[in-house]
UniProtKB/Swiss-Prot annotation:
Protein name per Swiss-Prot or TrEMBL: Large ribosomal subunit protein uL22
Keywords assigned: Ribonucleoprotein, Ribosomal protein, RNA-binding, rRNA-binding
A UniProt-annotated Pfam family: Ribosomal_L22
NCBIfam families: rplV_bact
Gene Ontology MF terms in the entry: rRNA binding; structural constituent of ribosome
Organism expressing this protein natively: Leifsonia xyli subsp. xyli (strain CTCB07)
Keyword set includes RNA-binding: yes
Keyword Ribonucleoprotein recorded: yes
Function, in words: This protein binds specifically to 23S rRNA; its binding is stimulated by other ribosomal proteins, e.g. L4, L17, and L20. It is important during the early stages of 50S assembly. It makes multiple contacts with different domains of the 23S rRNA in the assembled 50S subunit and ribosome. The globular domain of the protein is located near the polypeptide exit tunnel on the outside of the subunit, while an extended beta-hairpin is found that lines the wall of the exit tunnel in the center of the 70S ribosome.
């Protein structure tokens, strides 16, 4: 199972808006995710598009280094998440000498691509809990 990780840090997109875009591609095939992101109207779709393309390239390099065959059609977005980065604090001058604070938020975006493994495809059924409840 090939797994490749790509991260971008301190990207100037608010985490809430980035999560909206990342939620669209989670669980999809990598090529399908690129197609979705290419035509998504959100501003956060451009950095996420570049990140998925980088993760595909990372998987290709990782497969070459380990001398394994990698079919890029098999790659899918196994995990994708957005964490909040540092917040740039700016001030907006207001009337009568006041100042309002403006928070310019940043995001750390992580995308993990993986190939489906035969062991994962045939996951064993979870065992039912056999613990008995205490009766009064």
């Amino acid at each position: 199972m090939v797994e490749s990780i790509a991260r971008v840090r301190h990207i100037r997109v608010t985490p809430m808006k980035a999560r909206r875009v990342v939620n669209m591609i989670r669980g999809k095939q990598a090529q399908e995710a690129l197609a979705i992101l290419k035509f998504a109207p959100q501003g956060a779709s451009e950095p996420v598009y570049k990140l998925v393309a980088s993760a595909i390239a990372n998987a290709r390099v990782k497969a070459d280094q380990s001398n394994t065959y990698l079919d890029e059609q098999d790659l899918y977005v196994s995990r994708a998440f957005v964490d909040e980065g540092t917040t740039l604090k700016r001030f907006q001058p207001r009337a009568q000498g006041r100042a309002f604070r403006i928070n310019k938020r940043t995001s750390h975006i992580t995308v993990v691509l993986a190939t489906p493994d035969e062991a994962e495809a045939a996951q064993p059924a979870k065992k039912a809990s056999t613990a008995k409840k205490a009766s009064n």
